[in-house]
Amino acid sequence: MVLLEEKKIKHLEMIQGVINRMASNSFILKGWTVTLVAGLLALAGSKSEASLFRIACVPIMIFWGLDSYYLLQERLYRSLYVKVCRLSDKDIDFSMSATKAEFGNQKNSFLFCFFSATEFCFYFFLAFSCLALEFAIVK
């Protein structure tokens, strides 16, 4: 009986490791976004190039999409974690398959992740700031 409980705990630890990596990737992407956008804004300000403000929106959109993908993966693995918690000890098979086909609900969709509060507030604020600075510099 103890061995079976250990198997379940190990499986949950494996899933938790993936969830932690997804959260860490999301955090790193946000850092890269701020760094890259700050660099482009500094360059745009020093050269008085209004077009660089719009160019800064391109990496924002790319990183927003990537970050949403990581959030989606994190949510799918959280669903897998809950599923494994509910499994009986004898049914543990160490499956790491967390697909939308199995766990697909509204919360586990790319668009829902893209427009989630954390993603939308962060990336929209950055994009809006870039465009607002462009209009402030142009006038």
Q: Where is each model-derived feature located?
A:
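Cytosolic-side membrane-entry/anchor segment at the start of a transmembrane helix
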Residues: M1-G39
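Membrane-targeting and insertion segments and their boundary/processing signals
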Residues: E6-E13, L43-V58
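Residue-level recognition of hydrophobic positions within alpha-helical transmembrane segments
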Residues: L12, F63, Y69-Y70, F115, ...
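Hydrophobic alpha-helical transmembrane segments of multipass integral membrane proteins
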Residues: W32-G39, C57, M61-W64, F128
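Juxtamembrane "helix exit" motif at the C-terminal ends of alpha-helical transmembrane segments
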Residues: V37-L52, L126-K139
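Inner-leaflet juxtamembrane helices
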Residues: L52-F103
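A hydrophobic membrane-anchoring alpha-helix module
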Residues: I92-K139
